[in-house]
């Protein structure tokens, strides 16, 4: 009897492993899924830099159910001669695997080109066999008006902090002018971009999509040109897309989506503004428009985060909770937080990684993706950079995360 009780209350403390050996190459922005047969698939981008590196490719690896280690990396996607970045994996309710990623056509943030592939043949060894690949161009609703509303609100939201560094105002002005396809501005600009193409391009994925209560798939997209985010929707497995209105809130990017039982869609974002707090937006129409914007009382060092809803109904978030200006590298601590009220408060916090190595060594643990597998375990894949780089995989259960009084 005591043995049974012990099993019922057993706690799985964090365990971890490297997906591949540490190496000098840049390995970043991991995404992870569980396949219908119980394997784990992870994807990331690999190369020597970011948008200026035309050798960047999307790599992947597989951990077969019951295996002790990950497979050797394989190529998931590659547009030769273009930098491929920000892969996002997702398995939909029909059991199809999806991959989104971007290529920088002219090595600029204005020319990020969003692509999408789907596969029903991905359970064997090696890379998925893609049934089809498509390109996604956006037509953001009311973009000039959104940018004007954003500009009108920055003083009220940020006060003098908004002009604490010139980059905030410069990015805002650039986004406003690009939203209006200002031909004079474009003629004077020294980078290759043409008018409305920036509105159609420049939007990137980072966090996994969700399936809305109405059955549509929704993915958060963001732009470093407009310094904001929007939602993309598909009801046919990614063959056709529609897009909501961008958020009129400066600096909320890389949105991680979750939907409450009452239908409210919540987006948690990286902070590209001056406050260095986790940003939040709420929508009453499933991401078509966004009405409420506020900050969590959790620091964010301009770094990505991830959210998922657990089978218990509780929400889990993986994030860096430093501000990046306190003498430590902002991404040198990674934490898991638990919400028991659908993301309104986050009262449980556990540290997953913590390095006090001097900032000049740039240790970081960042860009996480979190999922829960069918056995109840919580899995996190993230960039792991003590000195060289790899992708790290960590797993634990909700009981371990819940078994803490407040923040550590």
Q: Model regions: which residues?
A:
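Sec-dependent signal peptide recognition
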Residues: 1-7
């Amino acid at each position: 009897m005591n043995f049974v009780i012990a099993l019922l209350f057993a706690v799985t403390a964090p365990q971890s492993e490297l997906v591949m050996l540490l190496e000098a190459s840049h390995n970043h922005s991991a995404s992870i899924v569980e396949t219908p047969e119980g394997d784990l698939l992870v994807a990331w981008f690999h190369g020597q830099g970011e948008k200026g590196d035309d050798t960047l490719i999307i790599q992947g690896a597989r951990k077969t159910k019951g295996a002790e280690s990950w497979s050797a990396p394989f190529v998931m996607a590659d547009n030769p001669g273009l930098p491929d970045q920000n892969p996002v994996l997702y398995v939909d309710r029909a059991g199809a695997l999806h991959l989104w990623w971007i290529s920088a056509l002219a090595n600029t943030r204005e020319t990020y080109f969003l692509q999408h592939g789907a596969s029903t043949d991905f359970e064997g060894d090696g890379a998925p066999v893609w049934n089809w690949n498509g390109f996604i161009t956006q037509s953001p609703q009311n973009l000039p008006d959104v940018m004007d509303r954003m500009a009108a609100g920055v003083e009220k939201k940020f006060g003098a902090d908004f002009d604490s560094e010139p980059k905030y105002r410069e990015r805002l002005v650039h986004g406003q002018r690009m939203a209006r396809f200002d031909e004079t501005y474009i003629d004077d600009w020294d980078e290759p971009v043409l008018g409305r193409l920036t509105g159609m391009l420049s939007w990137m994925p980072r966090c996994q999509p969700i399936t809305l209560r109405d059955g549509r798939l929704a993915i958060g997209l963001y732009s470093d040109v407009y310094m904001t985010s929007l939602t993309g929707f598909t009801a046919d497995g990614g063959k056709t897309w529609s897009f909501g209105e961008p958020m009129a809130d400066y600096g909320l990017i890389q949105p991680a989506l979750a939907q409450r039982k009452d239908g409210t869609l919540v987006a948690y974002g990286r902070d590209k503004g001056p406050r260095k707090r986790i940003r939040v937006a709420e929508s009453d129409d499933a991401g078509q428009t966004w009405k409420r914007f506020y900050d969590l009382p959790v620091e964010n060092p301009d770094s990505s985060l991830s959210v998922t809803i657990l089978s218990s109904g509780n929400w889990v978030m993986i994030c860096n909770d430093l501000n990046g200006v306190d003498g430590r590298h902002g991404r040198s601590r990674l934490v898991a937080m638990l919400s028991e009220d659908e993301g309104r408060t986050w009262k449980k916090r556990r540290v997953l990684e913590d390095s006090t190595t001097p900032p000049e060594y740039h240790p970081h643990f960042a860009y996480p993706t979190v999922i829960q597998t069918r056995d109840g375990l919580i899995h996190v894949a993230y960039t792991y950079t003590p000195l060289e780089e790899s992708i790290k995989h960590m797993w634990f259960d909700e009981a371990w995360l819940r078994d803490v009084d407040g923040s550590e």
